[in-house]
């Protein structure tokens, strides 16, 4: 089935993903979903980012016949002083590189604008961190759809913090809890858990803070906003947020699960560790394995990694601990443990097939940094969580898990400004206590209830993406809105 405009031409949507795996994976999956509905989908990115998912897109064309393609723009490596191949925040190998990548983004704006003018799409589906796309959409008289990574609850929290400013009350101590006013639930925070932009005065604003202000302005000027969530996870917040925002809002998540129904579960298919991980999981008992991953960007000090390793070892719980590709392990990792499947646990460097791990019957828990994708993937496959938020919006994402009763907390109170984790080191005893509480206390009423709730939510997530489900219908409605825009 082909989606056409009023002039008989196939509806053409251009997708512009941000240069970070946590952002580009769901947005590329959104492009695949549109293509599966007969929409011509063009993904605009840089060469080395395209390599990560090109084989999946090629198979979508070759096997499924989808009208989807990738167009690349040269990344300005030499101009910003980066080695060839470093084109995303995940590939950065030093603290200085993210700043250079941000600079590169500003240099990419003009060539991207020129390419969009050349391609003449009927709609731009843009990551939130490309606020300038609202201007090019206005110039071309086409709708701009903004992709927001987080759940409605998270954005409702952020909105109400900015409006009501409960964290600005006099004499509020860093360790004191306060309630965020006006929300459907009583949600509490400590000042130390808030993102830096909320705690700074206006004269302390950084370049990134200014970008966030541009993002907020572009939201108001966009035709609509898409969230990677599903109605049944947060019905009160879907309704609440949609009343707050002027642009229309849609949600057709979980995108990872929705897209897996097309053909391939994993977007990034080239995992060197696939066979090691799957063979090892196949040898474990059902629900016995703790999966530990803090994303591909966070940089823990060796002292913290050592505490985590000690806790995992002492708990006697089988585990998979995923480390960054260039993580230095010599000083803290027990000798012989790296990728040694004869051990009770696996330490794996680099990318792993996370969706496959989540779906495996041996996986019984997930220690997570509360990245948006990770939380949603755990919910989708019914895996209860141990939450350990670090930076960005992760303390807000933790509230989704807390309010819905889908896991337990390590108890982190300090937000980090960047990917270099400098907060207080959490001792192994505290980490071990959380691991054993979730993984060994399976007979306790608390853990039984958590597992029941997350399994029920998993069924709702999967039903939402079935034909006639809430997310399926939202995707259908969005495509129709874009068609109607082009009729006017």
Swiss-Prot record:
InterPro entries per the UniProt record, alphabetical: UDP_glucos_trans, UDP_glycos_trans_CS
Keywords, sorted A to Z: Glycosyltransferase, Transferase
Tissue specificity statement from the Swiss-Prot or TrEMBL entry: Expressed in the shoot apical meristem (SAM) and tuber.
Chain positions recorded as an anthocyanidin binding sites: 23, 392
EC code(s) of this entry: 2.4.1.-
Enzyme class at the top of the EC tree: transferase
PROSITE patterns: UDPGT (PS00375)
UniProt-annotated binding residues for UDP-alpha-D-glucose: 352, 354, 369, 373-374, 377, 393-394
Induction: Induced by wounding.
GO MF assignments: UDP-glucosyltransferase activity
Catalytic activity: solasodine + UDP-alpha-D-glucose = solasodine 3-beta-D-glucoside + UDP + H(+); solanidine + UDP-alpha-D-glucose = solanidine 3-O-beta-D-glucopyranoside + UDP + H(+); tomatidine + UDP-alpha-D-glucose = tomatidine 3-O-beta-D-glucopyranoside + UDP + H(+)
Active-site residues annotated for this sequence: 23 (proton acceptor), 127 (charge relay)
Keyword Metal-binding part of the UniProt annotation: no
One of the protein's GO biological processes: steroid metabolic process
Role this protein plays: Glucosyltransferase involved in the glucosylation of the steroidal alkaloid aglycons solanidine, solasodine and tomatidine to produce their corresponding glycoalkaloids.
Similarity section: Belongs to the UDP-glycosyltransferase family.
Name listed for the protein in its UniProt record: Solanidine UDP-glucose glucosyltransferase 1
Native source organism of the sequence: Solanum tuberosum
Gene name of the encoded protein: SGT1
